């Protein structure tokens, strides 16, 4: 009976291999048109049915024999297994403004159709081919075979599945439509991994997130939080410079006991502080919840997890505390300037009164001299 089972398995294998040669990939911007052997390989992994139970498993895992260990190990693998299949994410903050309309017009064939009414970002999709040009059905259906770039109007660009050697080529697309380019870009790294057999919709890990399903909306959600985080990081660095500048002013006042800053310089510091808080709240939209996250709970879960992971609220709280310190110093320095102006006006008034008294004395002396004559 075992021989007949082996012959039947061999015939089934040959039939599947022959039928797979007639299959072609459907047209997609991210896959080539080479024939696929993915369907055959998937069928070959099915168990050959028999009336007699087999004494040993012919599978690499024990899921078919009734054991749940395979599913448990699938979720919690070794470090090597966890690193396998990760899609790298690179977040950049390279300018203070990006013309999204011009960028969209130039890369129209790569634009991912929007799923929300938000106009402060665009998502671009680029093809990615394997060296052999052969894909399985699972690979064709996954967005992990494409490169994505999510660009935000306030200056952030998030790259998905882009190698380090290709980063500059993608960022050049952004630079052509950017204004206020920074001399030194801000950068952050993250990763995402797709596990269709994951029990939950998502699971967090060290410096990466595991999703049950990775789609373009997930990419948008991840990009929005990372874009806000890297922009917030830039704003914090700018505010830190202002704090250090005011600290130098206070140290100088402690040593000399005088305040020598000009009114123009103080107004410039006030403008920098106000523009930083306005950019974070209005342009970056730090407190504006994504429309995609409003519609579906699984995207909301990703959104909330990443905001907690990147400590968005806590970091903004620290930024707000530093801005309040700056605001307190500005009010103090303004009072010092006003007092200095008041002192100057008082001295001017005293000088004018002295002149008036001198003129009065002169007239009295002159009248007295005329009367004596």
From Swiss-Prot:
Result for mutant: residue 346 to K: In rrg-1; shorter root due to a reduced number of dividing cells affecting postembryonic root meristem size
Protein name per its UniProtKB record: Protein RETARDED ROOT GROWTH, mitochondrial
GO biological process assignments: regulation of cell division; regulation of DNA endoreduplication; regulation of root meristem growth
Expression sites (tissue/organ): Predominantly expressed in the root meristem, in the primary and lateral root tips. Also present in leaves and pollen.
Gene this protein is translated from: RRG
Compartment(s) of residence: Mitochondrion membrane; Mitochondrion
GO cellular component, one term: mitochondrial membrane
One Pfam family hit: DUF155
Disrupted-gene phenotype: Reduced number of dividing cells and slower rate of cell production and endoreduplication, thus affecting root meristem size and delaying postembryonic root growth. Decreased expression of several cell cycle genes indicating a defect in cell cycle progression. Extensive vacuolization in mitochondria.
Keywords: Cell cycle, Membrane, Mitochondrion, Transit peptide, Transmembrane, Transmembrane helix
Protein topology in the membrane: Single-pass membrane protein
Organism taxonomic ancestry: Eukaryota, Viridiplantae, Streptophyta, Embryophyta, Tracheophyta
Family: Belongs to the RMD1/sif2 family.
Coiled coil (UniProt feature): none
Record has Transmembrane as a keyword: yes
Boundaries of the annotated transit peptide in chain numbering: 1-49
Membrane-traversing stretches: 346-362
Role according to the record: Required for the maintenance of mitochondrial structure. Positive regulator of cell division and endoreduplication but negative regulator of cell expansion in the postembryonic root meristem, thus leading to the promotion of root growth.
């Amino acid at each position: 009976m075992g021989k007949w089972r082996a012959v039947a398995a061999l015939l089934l294998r040959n039939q599947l291999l022959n039928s797979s040669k007639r299959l072609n990939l459907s047209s997609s911007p991210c896959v080539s048109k080479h024939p696929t052997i993915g369907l055959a390989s998937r069928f070959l992994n099915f168990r050959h049915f028999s009336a007699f139970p087999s004494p040993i498993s012919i599978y690499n895992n024990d899921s078919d024999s009734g054991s749940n260990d395979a599913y448990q190990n699938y979720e919690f693998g070794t470090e090597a297994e966890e690193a396998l299949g990760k899609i790298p994410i690179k977040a950049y903050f390279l300018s203070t403004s990006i013309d999204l309309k011009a960028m969209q017009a130039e890369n129209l064939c790569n634009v991912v159709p929007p799923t929300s009414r938000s106009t402060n970002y665009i998502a671009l999709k680029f093809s990615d081919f394997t060296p052999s040009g052969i894909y399985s059905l699972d690979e064709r259906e996954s967005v992990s075979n494409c490169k994505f770039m999510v660009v935000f109007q306030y200056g952030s660009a998030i790259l998905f599945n882009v190698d380090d050697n290709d980063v500059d080529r993608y960022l050049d697309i952004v630079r052509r439509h950017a204004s206020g380019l920074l001399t030194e870009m801000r950068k952050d790294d993250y990763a995402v991994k797709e596990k269709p057999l994951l029990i939950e919709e998502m699971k967090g890990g060290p410096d990466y997130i595991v999703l049950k399903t990775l789609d373009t909306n997930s990419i948008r959600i991840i990009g929005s939080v990372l874009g806000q985080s890297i922009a917030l990081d830039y704003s914090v660095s700018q505010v830190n410079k202002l704090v250090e500048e005011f600290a130098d002013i206070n140290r100088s006042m402690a040593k000399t006991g005088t305040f020598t800053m000009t009114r123009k310089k103080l107004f410039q510091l006030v403008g920098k502080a106000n523009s930083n808080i306005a950019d974070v709240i209005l342009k970056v939209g730090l407190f504006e919840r994504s429309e995609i996250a409003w519609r579906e709970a699984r995207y909301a879960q990703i959104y909330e997890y990443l905001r907690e992971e990147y400590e968005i609220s806590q970091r903004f709280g620290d930024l707000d505390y530093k801005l309040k310190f700056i605001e307190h110093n500005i009010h103090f320095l303004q009072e010092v300037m006003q007092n200095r102006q008041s002192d100057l006006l008082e001295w001017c008034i005293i000088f004018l009164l002295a002149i008036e008294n001198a003129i009065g004395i002169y007239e009295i002396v002159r009248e007295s001299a005329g009367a004596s004559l």
